[in-house]
Amino acid sequence: MERAIERVLISAEEIERHVAEIGKQISRDFEGKDPIFVGVLKGCFIFMADLMRHVSINCSMDFMAVSSYKGTTSTGAVKINKDLNEDVEGRHLILVEDILDSGVTLNYLKNYLMVRHPASISIATLMDKPARRKAEVYADYSCFEIPDAFVVGYGLDYNERYRNLPYIGVLKPEIYS
Ligand code: IMP
Ligand code: MG
């Protein structure tokens, strides 16, 4: 598996440090607000699991599963495969994503959830690729700003593989072809 990786972009130790930091920051910002963390599956699963262990306030968790159609003729359409179980009216939502790329997915989700009248919607992302942004959406909490490269590991996949790598790596170009 690791032979497919060109280089390590972010080590496991570095991830641990930054995730702990935003966990503390969110705990300060949402003290007494009982937020709901909304994980966007599948990419969020390792990040969210680690992040939650650094959140020290009362909160709950829920998950959504989405898929986006991205081909060459991208319509920006996002399909909801699993919706929330909890009622979010009047609640503070924190969307947890693996990576903010074009922003199409999170922009869609924000609008989709807004009509349920939550008290607020914030975004926590492990990585942000600002160079590729198409939609007007910004992360409130971001661990790493990265260049425009396709990365895998720590929950992120290429064709469903490499999610189990403990670090963030850049794939070798020949893997794509
Ligand atoms: P967006 O709608 O373009 O912001 O896409 C966000 C989703 O695309 C993420 O949740 C990932 O699932 C996927 N994605 C974007 N960039 C990468 C990457 O470099 N590696 C793996 N998945 C990515
Ligand atoms: Mg994802």
Regions found by a protein language model. Name each.
Residues 1-177:
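PRPP-associated nucleotide enzymes
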